[in-house]
C-alpha cells in the first residue's frame, strides 16, 4: 500500500469548500449545506465506530474529477484523504489515458441548447435543466481554472462532433480546449496529479479499494469502508464523501446487464464499478446506465501483454493512410470506413445483428491492410495501453501475428484462406479500394489500392467509458430515488455522468472538472 501524507491530519479546519470560487456554477448554497461542519455534529452515539483514520473530506479516485475535488477542498482549508484503488504508478483512471481535450463552450445558453439537442427528448427525461446549466455554465471557467490553479496553458479548438445539429453553429468556433503543447501524453492530468499530491492537507492512499459507504442514523454519509490488501480500513469523513472513481468498463457482468453492445475497454482496468456496487445497497437513484461510448476506437484485446494490461483494448485503427478496408466475419465490406466516428455513434453499422442467424456478423470484423499501412495503425496517442503501457500497434506486429489476432499472406486468395472466408467475397471487398465509385460513399481520395504483402487483423469495438451510475443534482449531490439529496455524499465525472445518449468529445473531461470542483 502506498501513502502520500503531506501534512499530519488536523481535526479543526475551515468548512469544506467555503469559497465561492470553489463552488463556481454548481450551487454554492446547497453544496455548503451538504458539507457544513455542523452536518455530523449531532450524530447519535450508535454512530461511534473504531475509525482507522479521520479527516474532513474523503475523495475516491485520482482522475480529473477526484483531483479537482481534492484540490478545492484542500484550498479551502479542509483535510482530505484521497483514496485510489490502483498503485501510484497506475493512478489517474481514464483521465490519464484520454486525449486531454476539454469541451468548454464559451456561450452557456447556446451550449445548453446543443447539449439538449444531441441528447434528445427521450434521454432528457429525468435530466433537470439545472444540472445541464450548472455543467455548461461551469465549463466556460475551465481554461482560467487550469491556468490559475495548475499553470496549465490551453488553446481553443473547434471540435463540434455533430455539425448537423441545428444548434451546432451557435456553440462557436472555440468550443474545446486542448493543451498548448498538444493532445495526449497526460499533459493535463500529470501536472494536476503532481500539484494535488504535494498539497498541504492532502493524504493520498494508493492500493486502497473503496468498498462501501458509511452512514449515520440521520442518513448522512460519514465515511467509507476500504480495503488495503488483506486489511479493511474505516475512514471517517467529518464533512463529506466525494465519489469520483469512474464506471464499469471492466466489469463484464455489469456491461452485459446494461450495455447493449459487446465491446472491449480502452481505459484503466481498475474501473470495475465499485461505487455502483456500493450505492446499490442504499436508497440511491441511478441514471444513464445504458449510456456508453460504444466504438470510439477499434482494436484487439492485448492478451500478449502482462496482467496489468492483458484485459485492455489495444487500438489498431488506421489513421492517416487510405490503404485499408473493413469486412464482416465473412469477408464482405459493409460501410464507409472513413466516416466520422462520433465517439462510436457514427459506427452503428458495426452493431448490426442478424436475427435470422442469431449472430453479430460484424463482431468481430476484419481490417485488411498492406505493409505500408502498418505504421498508421493504432496511432491515436491515447488509451491505457499506449499512454501507461508505452506500446502501440506499429510496435507490435509480431505480437499480433504470433497471438493469432493477425494473419498475413502474399495474395488475396491466400489471405482469405487464413481468415476463413471465401476468396471471391474478399477480393470484391479489396477491389473496392481501386475504383472511383463506392457502394458506401467512401471518397476516392480516401482510398488507396493495396499491394504487396497483405495483413488482416480481427477487430472489436473499444469503448472509452460507461456513463451510468448514481444520479446527481446541480450541486453534485447524489440523490435518493425521491430526488432529495443524500446528505454529504457527492459525485463527479464518469460515475453517474450527465451524458445520456450522443456524446460530444471531451465532454466527460469537462464535467469531471466542473462537478469535481
Report each predicted region and the residues it spans.
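Beta1/beta-strand and adjacent pyrophosphate-binding region of the FAD-binding site
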Residues: 51-63
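Glycine-rich FAD pyrophosphate-binding loop
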Residues: 78-94
Amino acid at each position: 500500500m502506498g501513502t502520500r501524507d503531506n501534512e499530519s491530519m488536523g481535526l479543526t479546519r475551515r468548512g469544506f469548500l467555503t469559497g465561492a470560487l470553489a463552488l463556481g456554477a454548481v450551487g454554492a448554497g446547497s453544496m455548503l449545506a451538504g458539507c457544513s461542519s455542523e452536518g455530523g455534529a449531532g450524530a447519535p452515539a450508535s454512530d461511534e465506530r473504531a475509525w482507522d483514520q479521520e479527516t474532513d473530506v474523503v475523495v475516491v479516485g485520482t482522475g480529473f474529477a477526484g483531483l479537482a475535488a481534492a484540490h478545492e477542498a484542500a484550498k479551502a482549508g479542509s483535510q482530505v484523504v484521497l483514496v485510489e484503488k490502483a498503485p501510484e504508478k497506475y493512478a489517474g483512471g481514464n483521465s490519464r489515458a484520454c486525449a486531454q481535450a476539454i469541451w468548454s463552450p464559451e456561450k452557456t445558453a447556446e451550449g445548453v441548447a446543443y447539449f439538449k439537442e444531441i441528447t434528445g427528448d427521450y434521454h432528457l427525461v429525468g435530466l433537470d435543466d439545472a444540472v445541464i446549466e450548472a455543467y455548461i455554465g461551469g465549463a466556460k471557467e475551465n481554461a482560467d481554472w487550469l491556468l490559475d490553479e495548475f499553470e496549465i496553458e490551453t488553446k481553443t479548438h473547434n471540435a463540434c462532433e455533430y455539425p448537423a445539429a441545428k444548434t451546432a453553429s451557435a456553440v462557436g468556433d472555440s468550443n474545446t480546449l486542448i493543451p498548448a503543447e498538444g493532445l495526449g501524453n497526460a499533459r493535463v492530468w500529470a501536472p494536476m496529479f503532481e500539484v494535488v499530491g504535494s498539497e498541504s492537507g492532502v493524504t493520498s492512499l494508493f492500493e486502497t479499494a473503496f468498498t462501501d459507504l458509511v452512514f449515520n442514523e440521520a442518513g448522512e454519509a460519514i465515511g467509507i469502508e476500504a480495503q488495503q490488501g488483506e486489511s479493511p480500513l474505516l475512514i471517517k469523513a467529518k464533512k463529506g464523501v466525494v465519489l469520483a472513481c469512474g464506471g464499469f468498463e471492466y466489469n463484464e457482468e455489469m456491461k452485459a446487464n446494461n450495455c447493449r453492445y459487446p465491446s472491449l475497454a480502452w481505459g484503466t482496468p481498475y474501473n470495475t464499478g465499485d461505487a455502483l456496487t456500493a450505492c446499490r445497497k442504499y436508497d440511491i437513484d441511478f441514471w444513464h446506465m445504458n449510456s456508453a461510448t460504444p466504438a470510439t476506437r477499434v482494436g484487439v484485446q492485448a492478451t500478449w501483454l502482462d496482467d496489468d494490461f492483458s484485459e485492455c483494448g489495444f487500438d489498431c485503427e488506421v489513421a492517416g493512410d487510405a490503404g485499408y478496408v473493413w469486412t464482416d466475419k465473412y469477408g464482405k465490406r459493409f460501410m464507409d470506413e472513413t466516416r466520422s466516428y462520433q465517439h462510436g455513434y457514427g459506427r452503428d453499422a458495426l452493431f448490426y445483428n442478424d436475427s435470422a442467424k442469431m449472430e453479430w456478423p460484424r463482431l468481430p470484423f476484419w481490417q485488411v491492410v498492406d505493409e505500408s499501412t502498418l505504421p498508421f495503425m493504432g496511432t491515436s496517442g491515447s488509451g491505457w495501453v499506449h499512454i501507461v503501457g508505452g506500446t502501440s500497434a506499429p510496435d507490435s506486429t509480431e505480437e499480433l501475428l504470433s497471438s493469432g489476432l493477425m494473419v498475413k499472406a502474399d495474395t488475396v486468395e491466400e489471405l482469405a484462406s487464413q481468415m476463413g472466408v471465401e476468396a471471391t467475397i474478399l477480393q470484391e471487398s479489396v477491389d473496392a479500394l481501386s475504383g472511383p465509385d463506392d457502394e458506401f460513399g467512401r471518397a476516392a481520395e480516401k482510398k488507396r489500392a493495396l499491394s504487396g504483402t497483405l495483413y488482416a487483423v480481427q477487430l472489436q469495438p473499444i469503448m472509452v467509458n460507461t456513463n451510468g451510475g448514481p444520479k446527481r443534482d446541480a450541486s453534485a449531490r447524489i440523490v435518493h430515488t425521491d430526488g432529495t439529496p443524500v446528505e454529504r455524499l457527492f459525485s463527479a465525472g464518469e460515475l453517474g455522468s450527465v451524458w445520456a445518449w450522443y456524446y460530444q468529445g471531451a465532454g466527460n473531461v469537462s464535467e469531471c472538472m466542473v462537478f469535481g470542483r
